[in-house]
Amino acid sequence: MKPILIWAIFILFCSVLLVQQTLLQDKSPIETNILALLPENQQDPLAQQAFNQIANNINNRVVFLLQGKNRDTLVQAADHFSENLIKLPLFNEVEAQISEADQQAWASLYFPYRAQLLSEKTKSQLQKSAASRVLHVVRQVYSPFAGVSGGELKSDPFLLFRDYLSSRNSSNSHFSLYQNYLLSSVGDDFYIVIQASLAGDAYDTQLQQQLPQLLALEASVEQVFHVKLLHTGTLFYATYGTESAKGEIGTIGIGSLIGVLLLLLLVYRSSLPLLLALLSIGCGLLVAFVVTVLVFGKVHLFSLVFGASLIGVSIDYAFHYLTERLMHQGEWDAKRALKKIFNAITLGLVTSLIGYLGLLIAPFPGLQQLSLFSIVGLSSAYLTVVLCYPMLAKSPSKTSPPNLMMLHRWLQLWQNKTLRFILPSGLMVVALLGLTQIQFDDDIRQLQAMPEALKAQEQKIKEVTGVGQQQTLLLVKAPSDELLLQRLEQLSRQFEQWEVSGEIKSFQAISQFIPSIKSQQQSYALIKSLYEHQGETLSKKLNFSEQIVFNHSFSPLLIEHYLSSAVAKPLGFLWLGSIGQQSASVVIINDIKNTALIENYLQQQKAVSVLDKGAEISSIFAHYRLFISEMLAAAYFAIALLLIWRYGFKLAFKILTPPFIAGVVALAITVVFAIPITIFNLLALLLVLGIGIDYTLFFAEQKQKSESANTLLAITLSAITTVLSFGLLALSETQAIHGFGVTVFTGIVVAWLLAPLAMQREHQIK
């Protein structure tokens, strides 16, 4: 069977797989979560689980805030909105009104254990003076606003349980219950909060496609009821990121294709070269997508953005073949033409693959996926040219070659020894001066385009609900659940002091809702003593007909009881439970004012660590930025050895110098534009190396001096296509992608400019 037939069958098979992967699956194979690019925290499984649990809870929830001047109109708007919200396929649960069952959940959970539950304030008062409790109860009973009933006095004569419940609910002080809605007022405005749980993953592109229905509902509610409706949640940021990335992929891909089409029509003036070029590009992207999904299960949007840029590399192989066909009409031989450029395009592929193979071994899913996509895409484009072009382009071109006078003049300048030395050296010196101002930035936020409108809504919702603008997560560990709760109580006492002194705004910990058994035993002893020593006094003060008797046995309230109750719905996700030999929980601190004080305290707590995913990711980026730098240096070294083996040291130096200088200049220009250098700028240098080597290799492989103009025409067409792609990429709203585009754009221009340096004066190949 002929190789071209085998390749055609393989491409057909990949096309079928593409349909199966995209159209016949319930979920899209395109991953949009930026965290999926990153390696998991291998050093601390507890930290990784903590982050996953917190992220899942946050990612799958949406918070709505209705704002209006009239309370009753606002309630009507909330009724209409919540009734229609649950009808949307976007959500599987809506929390609007607080049901009677939810309101009773607190009493249902805690009331059976009331003889062992005390707030810290009440516990302190009883330890100092139990007699003062009697006076407190008397004042409450005779107060017209306290609402103490006979039934409550019978079951809880010292009113300890109401104090305990009141202390647990203090976190909701920003809101009051109005017609079963959580209502808050700030100035002249009233606010109602509604929460909803997504019916899937916030990063699922199919789920994101349903967002317009929600936006239409919000607009309708605002128009009909004359209220303002704000929203926040990962869904909105993820959808914005997806749409931005898709738009950029479209801009890059379509922009590149339009550039290719115009160049092909302008230079070759025939449909066959156009179809052949599209064939090699299409096969490269098709096979790369299918193989990446097969290996990783999904393909990340970033890989697609980077993959779209491979058009500029893969088209290079096609341009050289098509230029040969255009310039040798009378003596055209399709197979001989392939043989003529075979060494150059093969070496070009090998040198490109050398750079990407190093990334394949990195324990970094994002780099592995990007590397695989690039390797498979370039190899497939190369095989399409080698296997298909000789069969599909047997007939000679009927188009007259373009006038190459300008290209001849440019090449003639390169015969000048002074230019061959001054231009590369001058660029190198200027670039090195620019690099003295280089700054590195590994902040994960450079990968996120954060729209101001969404950020403003999020800040407003946090302000009204009393949630901190900045949250710090702490991971607390202990050998058992009981010791963990004791440790959380110890931390909570310190945090409560900071809350009072204004060092922090607030905090949330599981120990605020479920005391340790040790704490329950202490409370039980205090309450029992209170009944025994002050029961008779209280009976006389209130003229009870029966003696107050303590008849409660101790039965511990356990973490399992709390987690299975509706009370745990807001914060139950903070409890991680047991992993291996450890139990763990997360504490949230809102708006730290005195950072130094808190950091100093936490450093002294051996079982407490800060869960800062942003800092962790930035550290990972810094590590792999160094790794890619080393891989880039290794790629240059390996390519240098390969070139010296084939061409000798002198010509190898001439081949490698242009892409090297291009990379240095590209970094310098990026720095001049005040763009910090990231891992993505270094990935851009890999691309500059691969494309730049292609340019110089074709000059080095020339057998005759007359071929130089043909070679320059081909690499000029390739460079224009690539520059067009990355010129558009540099317009990205995402800082990291913008910087990536600027680096590649500059590098390709300089690589093209210096490529004739590799022309041989003695046209002999070793």
Regions found by a protein language model. Give the residues of each.
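Signature of alpha-helical transmembrane segments and their immediate interfacial
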Residues: M1-P29, C388-I444
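Juxtamembrane segments of multi-pass membrane proteins
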Residues: P424-K541
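Pore- and gate-forming transmembrane helices of large, multi-pass membrane proteins
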Residues: H328-A362, Q704-E733
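Hydrophobic transmembrane alpha-helices and their membrane-interface caps
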Residues: P273-H320, L651-F698
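Transmembrane alpha-helices and their membrane-interface boundaries in multi-pass membrane transporters
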Residues: L294, L310-L326, F342, T346, ...
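Solvent-exposed, non-transmembrane loop/terminal regulatory segments of multi-pass membrane proteins
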Residues: T22-K69, N172-Y178, Q437-P479, T696
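Extracytoplasmic
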Residues: N41, E100-L266, S270, I510-I644
